């Protein structure tokens, strides 16, 4: 979608349409008072206090009708400039405008407002010349929003809308908006029983339902086998640690605002972990290592907790409790290039399997003109940065350098993926760390018998299973590939009296092959059952009648297709096995 906020003409148009919305609301709800109505990437919104009245989605057409009536009158939009005193007098009975005016800088000599017909609002502008220009608009939705985004304040009603110069652009936007809604992983997650949330558990704490658990377990198995082939050793560690652990790692001093509050138990103070690296440092440090043992690769599917503002959490995409596909590689300096290349190759391998093509690599490097901001080892930095560049150039992946955006302790690689809708998201990361091994006094014995400090590569291929699941649900609109689908095959007997026995025998045979199969023997019409299987986006629906029973065959219909295919049971089993093996 076009970024309306960054388009000067569309920004002005949508800003004016926000005022048109407010004017229409004022006509229909005379007691309405208004907070702010800014332009955003997707259009505009206005926050409104209606007292005890509530605007619902079904009220939006009525408001649109009033907006069109006002626009047809063609009143000019006129700017007025006031002193602060004059502005306070003009809006004396509006507590929201009084609040805005009162907080304006005393040095601001001129306060502007705009008038269109019988409506005047405080605003910096700019606006279009007349309301007649506001022809092609649509109110999208209504939601709640706390005044000043503070949950201690009153809840206002927020109406979203969008405006374009012509009908074609508006219709294109609405189509894309419908596609975005259809791809929203929160809707898909609910429709397909992937996950849920509950206030008693808490915001940002998703509950994975049986179908979602299957998806997550398949993702875990998939990446586990890939990591195992590359020599990773997986561990389990507690999801809490002492405050002293995070003081040692530095997280307590530099990351505390993103952590949950600590809790005292007996004479110890614990905290939910925000990340797993401190635990993995201790595992590495548990034994003495020779240079010959390196690299040592420690992986974990670890539950972490990070504080997110309640207004920021979103389905599985942004959560407070997450499971990371985490690993830490302990390497010698001369192994950095080799291991970094292996990580990048693994990322590309995974993306190929999932059909991801629209992505770019972001290499965050230090600013050589501002060296005091970074860990003090010029040779280590120069060698590492050059080797990372060499790897990306050798593999031939698209990347850009972000100078000055490296962490204090080392350069970092982020993979930014463009989803089907919405802005780019970061899925995979690989961070070099020169400092953390020193904080934990980690070492290995080199070929001269001397202690040396290893370098650590923090890497996450999926990022978190939560965000990756959200991403894949939106990419596929919930039509997951066969190997990842919670239910792979749905069996429907035409008539239970004559075909249920054959269907049940087939069910057992397919389950013996470890396929995920359901049998729909409900007393419902055949067409209804088939449509429901399509709604659930089950890859294969088998319909079994006389012909199938008598000839030991099956007739299947693939999700999204109208045609059917008949084949022997053994042929079908072989076909399914081959499709699943492509990802194993």
Regions found by a protein language model. Give the residues of each.
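NTP/phosphate- and nucleic-acid-binding module
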Residues: 1-35, 39-41, 47-584
